[in-house]
Amino acid sequence: MRVCIRKNYKVALFSAIALSSSLFSVNSFAEDSSNPFSIIQSEPKSQLWINPGMASYHFQQDKNFNNGNWGAGLEYRFNTVASVTAGRFYNSDRAYSNYAGVYYQPIAIGPIKIGAVIGGFNGYPTTNNGGWFAAALPALTWEGDWVGANVFVIPTIGDRVHGAISLQLKLKVFEPKSE
């Protein structure tokens, strides 16, 4: 178990360093057209998205975790770089979880927004006895005219958090017509 935590700590540290480096390169070379990164201009928006939960691929395949994390959720995009989200899903431990959070994604590579979702979750029996806990997860988002997708990377933390890559498809159900 300690090896798993150390390994994930190293991956998280490397990811943080790489992200920091890319942020500096985005600012340094914003005018360079060969740089694939761009800073998203913060502008007001009003979009409501619904989702059916997530499909996950767990890193520990031998543990028989639930990969079909289906449920229902809402995401309200109030800005080009930020949105709020809340919902409920059947989690990896085969129990129900609730969540609420905020996405902040100020960077893009082409149509993909890059950032994090920060919020709270509950319903995991081995984490805080099923109570609420805070989490910050790297998140990628693609949004088309009516459909979109969020991808999350969840680190393994001992027996409390089950590492996975999760895909959440979403459907836009409301956006006022622009004048």
Identify the residue ranges that each predicted region occupies.
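Solvent-exposed loop/turn segments connecting transmembrane beta-strands
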Residues: F59-N67, R88-Y99, A108, N122-F133, ...
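N-terminal short leaders/motifs
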Residues: E31-S42, R94-P106, G119-Y124
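Outer-membrane beta-barrel "beta-signal"
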Residues: M54-S56, H162-E179
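Hydrophobic, lipid-facing positions within transmembrane beta-strands of outer-membrane proteins
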Residues: L48, G68-A72, A82, Y96-A100, ...
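Residues on the lipid-exposed face of transmembrane beta-strands in outer-membrane beta-barrel proteins
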Residues: P52, A72-Y76, A86, A100-P106, ...
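Repeated loop/turn-to-beta-strand initiation elements of outer-membrane beta-barrel proteins
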Residues: L48, T80-V84, G110-I112, W142-V151, ...
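Cleavable N-terminal export/targeting peptides
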Residues: M1-P44, K177-E179
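Short glycine/proline- and aromatic-enriched beta-strand/turn motifs that initiate or cap beta-hairpins
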Residues: A30-F78, G87-R88
